Design a protein with these regions (language model features):
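AMP-binding/adenylate-forming catalytic domain of the ANL superfamily
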Residues: 497-521, 538-542
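Structural core segment of the AMP-binding/adenylate-forming
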Residues: 53-54, 81-157, 479-481, 494
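Gly/Ser/Thr-rich phosphate-binding loop
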Residues: 239, 261-269, 278-346, 359-360, ...
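Conserved pre-ATP/AMP-binding loop-to-beta segment of ANL
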Residues: 23, 134, 147-153, 160-182, ...
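Conserved AMP-binding/adenylation subdomain of ANL enzymes
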Residues: 201-218, 226-266, 280-281
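AMP-binding/adenylate-forming catalytic core of the ANL superfamily
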Residues: 93, 110-112, 267, 385, ...
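Conserved beta-loop-beta connector loops within the AMP-binding
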Residues: 354, 360-382, 418-419, 481-485, ...
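Conserved AMP-binding/adenylate-forming core of the ANL superfamily
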Residues: 3, 7, 12, 16, ...
Length: 542
């Protein structure tokens, strides 16, 4: 193998190519700002040079806490162009969680949007972070200042350290880490998932294929860029030469304004977001082809019907942070046009088959044997291939466990249908997916342990058309103790991120929450029935 027949794969090549092929084409829309592909590449180069001038060395982590701004998109190229590793953090994290990820990742630099400064803990909780860069709408030319021992500078100050001196849009090792994405775990501590340049490159191509992108694509960022690097669409839309339309916050009225003003053709997101869009007062039938790719929870027949009524094509994908976001797609079959809408929606709600760039999924029993493809026998969904993470950062034991038997174990339970399509039946990792966010039930339960009135608690996800799952907290109070639902949620708001606080709090008598014979695990199926019955009587059924 030589340079003549092998070059390491990297998403950096995507921007290099598009800047050469489409130099004057609109690449980014962000508020009043617009960037051509030439300007996109120039800005990535400038920021990469600025990072190098700021002391970033190969392999150093650069953390971002930003909404879907141009700066966040540019980071997906600038950070690896400088040889660094991007750590894009969930903008809804609490200060404690931001501190944990900063310390665990060993980030040297933190770039944060001005409106998220309240989510940043004190300097002593940030570990190796030596400087914080603040992205503000109005960028004053300010000198760097010190805040509790932490150097604080404006984004314009950072830009001023850069230049347009070219850097190679290449890497020596395609297995080098391009980003670390943190995901909730059953212990409540996030795990750092390592993405390689090769995996990101290939998954981005899969996104292009299965979301049906072309150079004419106008992609609206309804999906957070911090979610699996925007399902690798940060790189994919750039690769095909499409236009990125940034969305700072998910508000249906702003989404519809941008849809019409910019001629949006594609958007991704959780069913909760798509339902909000479809039901907005501004909603109207599309006058052009619009492709909606959804994941995070199975789309309900209601949601699919509402989007199709607007003229959208709905594509359902499935994956996890550990597989670069989407790994499978519910590939459309021609005969589905002939079935009634309810049956079509049921078929489309399945998780489907491996993407073109992925290997096939298997459903296995505890001995790693394939279960019958009968649509009834449950087993664990396992995956492998180029679209699987390198491993968990600084956690060899968890990595080894996840890769048992040479396959990545998703922890999700599913069935294999006779047509080879996988259907997810349950989440086996104690994770509730609500509004596209992963919420650790264990974390919420543990946060409540110290409440003086609580003796026991269980968190469960209840199916919900809008959120995918609604988080419900079941509480058992100590004998003689008193507490209201407001007391409980107020207690939790001080300890976990706001999106993890349950939407409903139900009180149960001691012994009423169904447990296994050993009293060590809640029987979720039985508890779900009790919860749904309770919600039904209170009129709070999703």
């Amino acid at each position: 193998m030589s340079a003549a027949n092998f070059q390491p794969l990297t998403p950096l090549r995507f921007l290099e190519r598009s800047a050469a092929v489409f130099p004057d084409k609109l690449a980014i829309v962000c508020g009043d700002r617009r960037f051509t592909y030439r300007e996109f590449a120039d800005e990535a180069t400038r920021i990469a040079r600025a990072l190098l001038a700021s002391g970033i060395e190969p392999g150093d982590r650069v953390a971002y806490l930003c909404p879907n701004l141009a700066e966040m998109l540019i980071a997906h190229f600038a950070v690896p162009l400088a040889g660094g590793v991007l750590v894009a953090m969930n903008v809804r994290l609490s200060p404690a969680e931001v501190g944990y990820i900063s310390r665990h990742s060993g980030a040297k630099l933190l770039i944060v949007a001005e409106e998220l400064l309240s989510s940043v803990p004190d300097a002593g909780s940030l570990g190796d972070v030596g400087e914080m860069i603040v992205v503000a709408d109005s960028e004053p030319e300010m000198d760097a200042r010190s805040d509790g021992g932490l150097r604080v500078s404006s984004y314009e100050n950072l830009r001023g350290r850069g230049s347009l001196e070219p850097l190679p849009w290449a890497v020596k090792d395609e297995q080098a880490t391009i980003s670390i994405n943190y995901t909730s775990g059953t212990t409540g501590d996030p795990k750092g998932v390592l993405y390689s340049h090769r995996g990101a490159y290939l998954n981005a191509l899969g996104e292009i294929i299965h979301s049906e992108h072309s150079p004419s694509s106008v992609y609206l960022w309804t999906l957070p860029m911090f979610h699996c690097n925007g399902w690798c669409t940060t790189w994919g839309v750039t690769a095909i030469g499409g236009t990125h339309v940034c969305l700072r916050a998910v508000r249906p009225e702003e989404i519809w304004r941008l849809m019409d003003a910019e001629g949006v053709t594609h958007l991704n997101g959780a069913p909760a977001v798509m339902t909000a869009i479809a039901r907005a007062p501004e909603a109207h039938r599309f006058t052009r082809k619009v492709t909606v790719t959804t994941a995070g929870a199975a789309p309900s027949p209601t949601m699919i019907g509402e989007l199709e009524a607007l003229g959208a094509r709905v594509i359902h994908v499935y994956g996890l942070t550990e597989v670069y976001g989407p790994y499978s797609v519910c590939e459309w079959q021609p005969d589905w046009h002939e079935v009634d809408p309810a049956e079509r929606a049921r078929k489309l709600a399945r998780q489907g088959v491996g993407m073109v760039t992925a290997e096939r999924m298997r459903i296995v029993d505890a001995e790693m044997n394939d279960v019958p493809a009968d649509g009834e026998t449950m087993g664990e969904i396992v995956m492998r291939g180029n679209d699987v993470m390198k491993g968990y950062y600084r956690d060899e034991d968890a990595t080894a466990l996840a890769f048992t038997g040479g396959w990545f174990h998703s922890g999700d339970l599913g069935v294999m249908h006779p047509d080879g399509y996988v259907e997810l039946m349950d989440r086996a990792k104690d994770i509730v997916i609500s509004g596209g966010e992963n919420i650790s039930t264990v974390e919420v339960e543990q946060a409540l342990v110290s409440h003086p009135a609580v003796v026991d608690a269980a968190v469960i996800g209840v199916p919900d058309d809008r959120l995918g799952q609604m988080v419900v907290l079941c509480v058992v109070l100590k004998e003689g103790a008193e507490a209201t639902a407001g007391d409980i949620t107020g207690f939790l708001k001080a300890r976990v991120s706001s999106y993890k606080v349950p939407k409903q709090v139900l009180f149960f008598a001691d012994g009423e929450i169904p447990m296994t014979g050993s009293d060590t695990k809640v029987i979720d199926r039985d508890l779900l029935g009790l919860v749904q019955a309770r919600l039904s009587t209170t009129g709070a059924t999703p």
